[in-house]
Amino acid sequence: MKKKLIAAILTGAMLVAGMSTSVWADGEKSFVYGTTGYSEEMGDAGLNPHDNYSGWSALRYGVGETLFKYNDNMEVEPWLATDYEFVDDTTVKITLRDGVKFSSGRTMDAEAVKECLEDLIAVHDRAPYDLKIDHIDADGLTLTIYTTEPCPAIINYLGDPYGAIIDMDYGVQGEGGSANVAGTGPYIAENVTPTQIDLVKNENYWGGEVKVDKVTVKSFADGSALTAALQTGDIQGTYGLQYDNYPLFENNSDYTINSCATSRCFFGQFNMDSEIMQDQNVRKAVEMGIDKDGFCSVIMQGRGVPAKAAFPSSFSYGNDAVETVSYDPDGAKKLLEESGWTDTDGDGYVDKDGQKLSINWLTYPTRLEQPKLAEYAQATLKDIGIDVVVNNTSDHMTIAKSGDFDVYVSSTTTAPTGDPEYFFTSTVTGAKNYGNYQNEEVTKLTDQLHQTFDKDERSKLAVELQQDILDDDAFFFVSHLNMGIVTKPNVTGMAAHPCAYYGITPSLDVMYMFVENKILWILCFL
């Protein structure tokens, strides 16, 4: 009623001024959000948290919530839970929040959470190893998890998006990129496709008033199209803007930029089964031939920090704790020469036994800077005599799994749970180890990290593990990224977060009206 009254007053005032208007014609607030971070090729399309990385979308777009979440300092806090206690090394007792309902209408209790977690570990690729769940007891609002072995990071992992609590009685409606679920979040998905999600506010949300009535999430595969949509007003906010497009919106009163440092990193894996890449001198030469400082300053426009290893300097086990090679074209050429690679025919590329040194660089387009990184590396590696053939494809996952590459460059949030373990268990020794890197000591240390409770010891193990993979030249790390959300200035309640899990929240609010296709900002609070 209040919104309709104010809308009517404003409409009348503008009609007196002779201006045509369309002011919240249905009395509702709406918000259109554009992103390059939602797609089938990224593995996060659909809203089923038990499928690949779709839990990220369930959390980001306000449909799902986890038992625990991370604050701005990446410290674990209760969310759907209110407390927890380690009874012993293999038993944790969790108290659940009272008064929470799924969007299906079912009350969330320990039995519902048990059903959800049991389905998760039955079907997910990472969760069983991370959580080590043996069995679960449910009693009212008390959930007791028993693990097969000590699992110090279980509370952190229960904040991973795959841990979004959904109603298994409601089940999963649809498949893959069209999957819909009943969560506990501030929004309910009415329609889900691999390219768009239509949301309405949850009128019975346990966490208070939800301010915006309808939200549309639109996926953009093309960065230029995303930028244009923000400029024309087709969308009101975005995550995933090309970094070289930020100057269009900086120091511009028509937009607001909110950003923060994250552990998201552009990094590469060498294919250890590739004959060329089995030569460590070649791997090291590739690393020494990439100008990380130049990439961060020129391509990233200063919104990235050169990376030594998996974690940024804000972590005690981050960049400053490890050593690796730096940009050194002359040193790279010497390494290649040591392995018999020289330019015998004067074409600018080194060769051996009549074969030019050519590497297959696999990447994908939805992380908009990755193709640019490929082009940048193509140019700098040419300077040391290496030919780079870029395969920039949305089908990168299929190719990565097949092993048809020499270098696979992707991006990941290396510490999304505020703990170092995730990167090693998922990417170095786990399912995302597409380069088939094998090192018994690294596997042993990863297992040790998985069972270590002491935080200082966990940090030491993280440093040792990073140094091992750097010394083996199995991975290389290019840049740690800042996360930025760009919105129209009448949009409030959207903030960048270090783990990039949280986007559409109950705090989101919009104040606007359209006047002859121009937005008149209403600087007031209802």
Kindly give the residue locations of the regions a language model identified.
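Gly/Pro-rich hinge or "lid" segments in bacterial periplasmic/extracellular proteins
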Residues: 53-54, 75, 159-210, 214, ...
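Detector for C-terminal structural segments
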Residues: 196, 289-319, 369-378, 400-526
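Structural transition elements
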Residues: 306-344, 365-371
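Surface-exposed binding/hinge segments that line
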Residues: 85-89, 93, 128-170
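N-terminal lobe/hinge region of extracytoplasmic solute-binding protein
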Residues: 34-87, 182-183
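Aromatic- and charge-enriched surface segment that lines or borders ligand/interaction sites
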Residues: 82-123, 276-278
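Ligand-site clamp/hinge motif
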Residues: 203-248, 387
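Ligand/substrate-recognition segments at binding pockets and active sites
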Residues: 342-414
